[in-house]
């Protein structure tokens, strides 16, 4: 085992074949920067039919994942010293970029993917955190789990060819990223801004910061409001925060 360790408990391991076709993750796997192990819940199912779900007590629609297979799969995983267990759930805290930064200091993430109508409530005791992708419901936790593997992997040292590419990305500074342009200079009467052509790096930097602030204000004002709410309770100058982005 080498690099950052992901252990994923899932009923549909084939959903993770996607990671072998994602450039960033593939490179990290090839460099042994990460290790991804899948635990098929069906292998821990009960009886000759490998049952993993059952009808809910009290009635209701759908099927619920049984606790026994999930606990067996979880207990089969060798825990590393710095490890956290995530439960993918629409009831969880919405995933943010800062979560990737926080988890990157760990050695291991164990990710439990829900399915159907969810999982037996007793499974929650295994989790350190419950994580949601947003205020919507997917058919299972596999796609969110792939997103977590992708988002965390790309910030690990050695993954990206140019580490500086992370600096100005959307959400890394609580602002959305500035617009990007490449050749041709004019396309369908749409021109690249002159400031990006003139070679004045100070003007380019100022333009990019203005674009980040304007774009965030127009599209995600909540990010600015939350950041200034934090700064309001500290000695940090809000103008200094803007120039430090």
Swiss-Prot record:
GO biological process terms on file:
tRNA N1-guanine methylation
Q: Does the keyword DNA-binding apply?
A: no
Name any one GO molecular function.
tRNA (guanine(37)-N1)-methyltransferase activity
Query: What are the record keywords, sorted?
Result: Cytoplasm, Methyltransferase, S-adenosyl-L-methionine, Transferase, tRNA processing
Q: Where does S-adenosyl-L-methionine bind?
A: 114, 133-138
What CDD domains does the record tag this protein with? TrmD-like
Q: Say where the protein is mainly found.
A: cytoplasm
* SUPFAM superfamilies tied to this protein: alpha/beta knot
* Enzyme Commission number, as recorded: 2.1.1.228
Which Gene3D superfamilies does the protein's record reference? 3.40.1280.10, tRNA(m1g37)methyltransferase, domain 2 (1.10.1270.20)
Q: Name one GO cellular component term.
A: cytosol
Q: Where in the cell is it found?
A: Cytoplasm
The question of whether S-adenosyl-L-methionine is a record keyword is answered with yes
What this chain does, per the record?
Specifically methylates guanosine-37 in various tRNAs.
Name the family the entry cites.
Belongs to the RNA methyltransferase TrmD family.
Check the record and name the PANTHER family matching this protein.
TRNA (GUANINE-N(1)-)-METHYLTRANSFERASE
Q: How does it assemble?
A: Homodimer.
**Designated name of the protein:** tRNA (guanine-N(1)-)-methyltransferase
Q: Which organism's genome codes for this protein?
A: Prochlorococcus marinus (strain MIT 9215)
Which lineage ranks, top first, belong to the organism behind this chain? Bacteria, Bacillati, Cyanobacteriota, Cyanophyceae, Synechococcales
């Amino acid at each position: 085992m080498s690099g950052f360790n992901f252990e994923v408990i899932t009923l549909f391991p084939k959903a993770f074949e996607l990671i072998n076709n994602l450039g960033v993750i593939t490179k990290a796997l090839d460099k042994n920067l990460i290790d991804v192990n899948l635990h098929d819940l069906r292998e821990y199912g009960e009886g000759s039919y490998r049952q993993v779900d059952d009808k809910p007590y009290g009635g209701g629609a759908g099927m619920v994942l049984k606790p026994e297979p999930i606990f067996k799969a979880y207990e089969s995983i060798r825990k590393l010293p710095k490890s956290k267990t995530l439960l993918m759930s629409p009831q969880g805290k919405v995933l943010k970029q800062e979560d990737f930064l926080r988890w990157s200091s760990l050695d291991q993430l164990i990710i439990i993917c829900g399915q159907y109508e969810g999982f037996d409530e007793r499974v929650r005791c295994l989790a350190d955190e419950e994580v949601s992708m947003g205020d919507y419901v997917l058919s299972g936790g596999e796609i969110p789990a792939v997103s977590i593997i992708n988002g965390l992997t790309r910030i690990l040292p050695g993954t990206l060819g140019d580490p500086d590419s992370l600096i100005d990305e959307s959400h890394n500074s609580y602002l959305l990223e500035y617009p990007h342009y490449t050749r041709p200079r004019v396309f369908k009467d749409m021109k690249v801004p002159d400031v990006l052509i003139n070679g004045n790096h100070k003007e380019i930097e100022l333009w990019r910061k203005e674009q980040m602030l304007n774009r965030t204000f127009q599209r995600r004002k909540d990010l600015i409001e939350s950041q200034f709410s934090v700064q309001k309770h500290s000695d940090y100058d809000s103008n200094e925060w803007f120039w430090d982005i």
